[in-house]
Every structure is written in structure tokens, then in C-alpha cells.
């Protein structure tokens, strides 16, 4: 296993979590696979260990904690606000190296003060990392899904393109492809005639049935990645969007925005100046951005030491605002020790009867061990 449950890092994290006013929750190793297949990103879906029970239900080894912690909260019909801590194994397939890792984190559900709970999440994550690696050189990088969404709206992009760009936010290669599609610069391979007709008619259910049949004929499980229904929806959406083009001047502004990378203490001023110069209405999202920055400073974290990167996000539908990472030079996976963010849509997507906002983070213990020189 990558990371040891008897290491100094493990023990320091356990002690720190115990002091963060969060209930340590036990989550079963075997989980229903569908929530992860439906909501997780493309990279995680490919790495899930899948199996079936005797009834044919898709199951998996726990690939992460956020989704099952939220499902557990819904199942218990627990009151909010509620904070959950976790520390345990996650399982992800890799071509080489370990497939079992230790993760720790906190999920903060139902807090009414968004700015304060965002700041607390960063402070909690930083405290956990610092407890294990007090002398490490760290970098905090922060992004904001809502500022990016506000930028797309201010530019007047159609809803379909906004959704497509939001799904690519944080994935540089995917974003580049979508921007190329917007300018008409990308050539698209023609669809097989049998599929093209259904796409042209917008027959999503018929297209999904045909895709599922072709997958089964080819020996591909329809639950191994994107579902036939999701593929059908995206094919039809892509065809609709192909007819839409956007002014080059607006795309240039979007690219300029995505190149913004400044310290958090100057980020709001930089963004307001950009909005004013180009007559963009970002007032509402920047008001929330400034409130969070103030809350972060009030939590004792120097905003001059945090980088705001306008292109940093996560290509997952349920992230709605803050996203962040704590990084260290020389550590694998681009130095990422911890990652977190706000996911106000997730619990509703998982079946909650009311809107429950959430923010949380996960820490990779094996990377922390590497940083402090512990043997795995």
C-alpha cells in the first residue's frame, strides 16, 4: 500500500483531524459504482476497480471519499451543518506502481457562511499538511469555478457553449479543443451514417440504444466508462453547437482571462480592472470572491502567499466555486499534496431532498511521506 497506517505522517494527521471539530466517519470499502461512474471525472472513471454482486449490480472498491461521505450523510438524514473527517484506503488502477493509497480529509456540509467555510477548508487542509511537514516549502493555488462561469455569461456565450466550457475548465487539453471548436478551427471526423441520422434527428434515446448495442457487440461493457445515454447526449449537443460560432474578439478576451495568474491579495483588483476595461459584468461573482479572500485572511493565512490562477478548475459538474491545491516542489503528481473545493450541487445530484452546500479536501498520505522522507 502507498502510505503506511503506522507512519509518523499517519499519526500526525489522525491527531490533527481529531482537533478539527469533525466526526471521524467509517465508510465501507465496497461501494455502488454508479455514483462514481455518473459523476466522477474521466480519469477517475478509467481507474475504478469494478465488480458485480450476484444480482448484477455494479460495485467498486472505494476510489475516493467525497461521494460516499455525502451519500452516507443523506442516508442517515443527518442534520446540518455537519463536519465529517476520514482517514483510510482508496483504490485506483495504475499501469505501474501501487493501486491502494491512504487518503485523509474533511467534508464540511450545510454551512451557511460560504466564505467562512471555504476559508476554514483551506485552513484545515494547511494545518493537516503542516502537522506532518512543518518545514516544507508549500504553494497554495486557488481557482474559482463561479468566476469562470460569470466570465462566460458576461461574454454572452450561449448556454450550450457555457456548459461545454465549464466541463473542460481545469483540463488544458480539453479547453484548447473546445476553444478550437468555437472558432471553427477544429476538423471533426464524420459519424457513421447509422449514427449520423439519429444525431441529426436529435433522437437521444434511439441513439443511446444503438450505441449500447454496438458496445455490447464489440465486447465493451456499457458501464465501463461514459454511459450510452451520456455519449448520445454529448453527440447531439456537439452537433447543435457546431452550428454556433463566436466573435474572435470575445474569444481573445476569454483567453486573456484564463492567463491571469496573480497573488490572491491582488486578484480582486486585477479582475475588477479587467472587467471594467472590457465592460464585463462580473460584480456579483467578484463580491463573493472578495468576501472569501477576506475570510481567508481572517483565518490567519497570508493571501500574498496564495496564487490565484484563473485557469485552475476541475472538470466536474458538481464543483461550483472555490477549488484549491496545496503543492510542494519535487513531489510526484505535480507536487499535489492536498486538493479541495466547493461542491454545492453534489448532494442534490446524489438524491438529497434539499439543497445542502458542501466544501472539502483530500490529502495524499504517500506524497506527504515522500516529502518528509518516510519510507512507504
Swiss-Prot record:
Name the pathway it acts in.
Amino-acid biosynthesis; L-histidine biosynthesis; L-histidine from 5-phospho-alpha-D-ribose 1-diphosphate: step 1/9
Q: What is its main location?
A: cytoplasm
Where in the cell is the protein located? Answer: Cytoplasm
Keywords of the record, alphabetical order, are:
Amino-acid biosynthesis, Cytoplasm, Histidine biosynthesis
The Gene Ontology CC terms held by the record are:
cytoplasm
The terms under GO molecular function for this entry are: histidine-tRNA ligase activity
Sorted alphabetically, the Gene Ontology BP terms of this entry are:
histidyl-tRNA aminoacylation; L-histidine biosynthetic process
User: Carries keyword Flavoprotein?
Assistant: no
Miscellaneous field: This function is generally fulfilled by the C-terminal part of HisG, which is missing in some bacteria such as this one.
Which protein family is named in the record? Answer: Belongs to the class-II aminoacyl-tRNA synthetase family. HisZ subfamily.
Q: How does it assemble?
A: Heteromultimer composed of HisG and HisZ subunits.
Q: What function is annotated for this protein? A: Required for the first step of histidine biosynthesis. May allow the feedback regulation of ATP phosphoribosyltransferase activity by histidine.
From the Swiss-Prot or TrEMBL record, give the protein name.
Answer: ATP phosphoribosyltransferase regulatory subunit
Taxonomic lineage is: Bacteria, Pseudomonadati, Pseudomonadota, Alphaproteobacteria, Hyphomicrobiales
Task: Report the gene name.
Answer: hisZ
